């Protein structure tokens, strides 16, 4: 493991030095081109002009699918955090609240349970519940509104998300019919 000082050192120079230290400066070097910005690759290529850079995106993607037991447990924990946070936010829902109130309860619960961050928070209610990937607004919740909430909890760069749907009070007839068809 090599560490570079963020904002004070060039990570590509550190990587080039590591590759050289391993004796690979004239060999094949697998690069995740779909992730590495072009400007960074150009720096790396200039620092290692004799290296044969090859696309290794598929290899990295395949390796990410393999999880250690510790990684699997962390993903389970993150899923539980996300699920519990959504449950806590739904428990707090009452007519007259706003979507922002739901978001506040959601994020508070995520952090209280030990997550370091969250990603892709969706809070959509009423007519907005049909829209994809929308964040919370100051829309006021009404009796019978459908609430769609999704959040990804994050620890050490690992993400796990959960999406749930509920209603404010009793659901409208159409929502109950859709639910009945889904569980049939």
Task: Label each residue range with its predicted role.
Residues 1-184:
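Active-site neighborhoods and metal-handling regions in enzymes and metal-associated proteins
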């Amino acid at each position: 493991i090599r560490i570079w000082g963020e904002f004070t050192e060039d990570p590509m120079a550190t990587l080039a030095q590591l590759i050289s230290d391993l004796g690979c400066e004239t060999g094949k070097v697998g690069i995740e081109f779909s992730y590495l910005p072009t400007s960074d690759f150009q720096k790396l290529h200039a620092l290692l002009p004799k290296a044969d850079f090859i696309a290794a995106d598929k290899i990295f993607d395949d390796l990410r699918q393999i999880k250690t037991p510790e990684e699997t447990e962390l993903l389970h924990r993150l899923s539980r955090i996300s699920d519990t946070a959504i449950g806590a936010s739904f428990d707090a829902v009452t007519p007259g609240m706003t979507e922002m109130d739901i978001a506040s309860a959601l994020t508070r619960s995520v952090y209280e349970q030990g997550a370091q961050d969250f990603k892709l928070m969706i809070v959509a209610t009423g007519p907005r519940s049909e829209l994809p990937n929308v964040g919370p607004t100051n829309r006021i919740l009404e009796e019978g509104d459908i609430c769609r909430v999704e959040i990804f909890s994050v620890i050490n760069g690992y993400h796990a998300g959960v999406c749930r749907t509920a209603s404010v009070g009793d659901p409208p007839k159409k929502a109950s019919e859709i639910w009945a068809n889904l569980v049939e």
